[in-house]
């Protein structure tokens, strides 16, 4: 248990009346005005018996210092005493009469009577502006709960629900008000939306073309197109009958060009029907254009060559002396003539 001790104000009165501390005295006992020696000993060094007897007595009274056991610390004693004086609600400093410089520095204080003591030191009374701001903050809550005639007819449960919601409704949550059938339907629509509309159910896509003007009001729903007829035609045409395979085979014909015989399948290629343009260009796709181009190929790449054993080969043509050139000369004679020409040119030079 902490030891009960005398409070600071009666303790100070006792120290002043004892006249044991030099410089501590009453200036006006009727008005409870007194002075305390307040030397700045840090400048010239501490003299405990002269500069800090009051601070030492307060440290001993509060148990912060034990004579003969603790080392003297007048600087700490003075700081603790100043903090205790500033925390008292019934003692205030008379600053216009205090002298804080020089060798005879002191501070003057006054003990306040009971009638002048504030209820709690440090707490300022509320101003009119703070009261007005608080009143304005309470008005919107009261006005939202009141009816058009100024009389509030809402129950406390509904008031708590309304203040918690604050007109913020989630589109995925349905808010249900229980036990409020007596409320007006118009007020319910204004305060709470019990069934908010479900959104994001239909995705709309806009299309534009050269013929049609761009208009944001003309919206078309997004649809998945069915399988095109071109894909169906591919599946049906991929499986051909034996007759079609026979018709698709190339027919080889004999042809002779400049006395030489060749095998050719020109003019026997089958024509393949391609899907019409209506398959790709429809009224739903006004901007789509498809161009199909087929390169000419004299012979299919996947066809095989027929055997040549059944076909008669032409007899080899042997050259005859009549077919040779009459002015044909041997290689040796040509070399001899050229050598004679070069020698003649050298001599002429």
Curated annotation (Swiss-Prot):
Crosslink position(s): Glycyl lysine isopeptide (Lys-Gly) (interchain with G-Cter in SUMO): 137, 166, 293
Gene Ontology molecular functions: DNA-binding transcription activator activity, RNA polymerase II-specific; DNA-binding transcription factor activity; RNA polymerase II transcription regulatory region sequence-specific DNA binding
Localization, UniProt: Nucleus
The entry's DNA-binding region: 5-113
Induction per the UniProt record: By viruses and IFN.
List of residues that carry Phosphoserine: 225
Similarity comment: family membership: Belongs to the IRF family.
Name of this protein: Interferon regulatory factor 2
Organism, as annotated: Mus musculus (Mouse)
Organism phylogeny: Eukaryota, Metazoa, Chordata, Craniata, Vertebrata
